[in-house]
Amino acid sequence: MRRHATSGLPFRSRTQTGIDVVTTEEGDKPKMTMPEPGPGSAAAALAAFRADLPLKAPNARSLAATIENPGCTARRVLDSAGVDKVALATRIGTPLPQEQSVFAINRGNRFEADLKADDYAALIELLRQAKFEVDRVEILRLRNLYPISPRNPDIALEKRAAATRSAILGMAAGESSAPNLIDGGALRWDFGGAVARLETDGIAWRLGGRIHIIEIKSFPLVDGRGDPEKVGAAAWQAAVYVSAITDMLAEQGFDTNLVSTEVLLVCPRNTSLTPTMAPLDVARQTRSLRRLLAGRRQVGDVLAALGDDATLDTAGMSAEAAATHLADVLERLGTNYLPSCLAACPLAYHCRDRARATGNPACLGPEVRTSLAGVQSLPRVLELAVGASPGAGESDAAAMLMRAARLLRAADSSALVDAR
C-alpha cells in the first residue's frame, strides 16, 4: 500500500534546551474537497433535519459529554447533524449563560502559548522527562498550515485531518520522514453513522515506541492531582481521540496497540502557569466507549423512525410556535436529563425544566435515578412509599421506599416523644 508523508518546507532551529527541532509550516498542502451529501444519504438526512440552524461540528468535548449520557438520543442526533446547540437553546428560549469566564479563557490561552513558545521548548522538556526521544524533534504545525476561519472552519479541519492521517500512517509504517509531534492535528471519526471532525492538542510519537495523545488543560494539578470532575472529563475527551486513531490504524491493517491508552495530561502546577505533566490512563473510558457505541442504533435509523416531520425546520412559524415545535422534536427523539448536563450541554436548562415538570427522578441526580430504577415519576415515588401496589419493574424501588418511609415515621415519633 502506498503512503504519502505530509510534505512541506522544513526549517531547523534549536530550543533553549539545546534540542534540534524541525518544523513544517509551509509548502505543498494536501488537497481535499468537502463531500457533498447525496440524495437519500445519511448526510442528506442529517442536513434536512438541521434545516436552517447554524452548522457546528461536534468536538471531542461535546462527544465525550454525549457518550457519558447514553440515554440521551436527542443529543447524539444533534451532534451527528452538526446542530449548534447554543442556537437551538436560544430559539427554544432557555439559553445557558456563558460557560467559561473571560479570565479563565485568557489564562488558558496564555498557558498554552507559554507551553509552545520557543519552538515548544517547555512541552519538549516535559516530554524528555517522560523518556520521549527528543534528540531531534520534527513538529508538524497544522495550526499554522491550516488556520481555522470562523466563516468556514470545516475546510481547514478537513485539510488538517488529511495531513494528520498521512502523518499517523507514516508513524505506524516507521517512515523516517514522519513527524514525532503533531500540533493541532485533526481526526475524522465515525460514531453511530455520522462523522465528527476532532481537533487534538497534540499527538506524540516514539514515546516507548507508541503514539500518545497530549491533552492540554488549564486547570491546575496540585501535588500531581487535579479536580476529579475535570480530570474525568479530560479522560473521556482523550478516549475519543484514542478511539479515533485506533480505528484509523485498524482500517489500514496496522497493530492497534501502537496507540497508547496512557494520555499525557499537561496542566499548570499548583497556582502558577508553570507546566507539569501527569499520565492519565483512559483504558477504562476507551472500553466503555466501545461498548456504548456497539449497542447504539444508527442515527439514520432513529430519524427514519420519527418520520419526515421530525426536523428542526421552523420556517414560517412565530417565535412561540417555533419554540414549541423544537421542544416537541427533542421530546420525540428522547432526552435524558442529569444534573451533570448543566456543565456539558447548552440545552440543559430546557431539559431540566421538562424533567421537573414531569416529575422525572433524574432531576435529583444519577444516584437517585439509579435507586429508583423502574419508577417513572416523583408522584409515583410518593404513592409507592405509602403502600401502593408496585407495577412491572417497580418492586425493588417500592420495597426500599416503604422501608425509608417507616424509618421516617419512627424518627418523627421519637422526636415527638422527646418534645413532650
Language-model segment annotations:
Residues 178-179, 185-295:
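Mg2+/Mn2+-dependent nuclease catalytic core
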Residues 2-205:
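Metal-dependent nuclease catalytic cores that hydrolyze phosphodiester bonds in DNA/RNA
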Residues 38, 156, 160, 291-295, ...:
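Non-membrane alpha-helical secondary structure
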Residues 356-420:
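C-terminal non-catalytic accessory extensions
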Residues 271-333, 373:
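A broadly conserved sequence feature marking short terminus-proximal activation segments
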Residues 313-364:
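Cysteine-cluster motifs in flexible loop/terminal segments that predominantly coordinate metals
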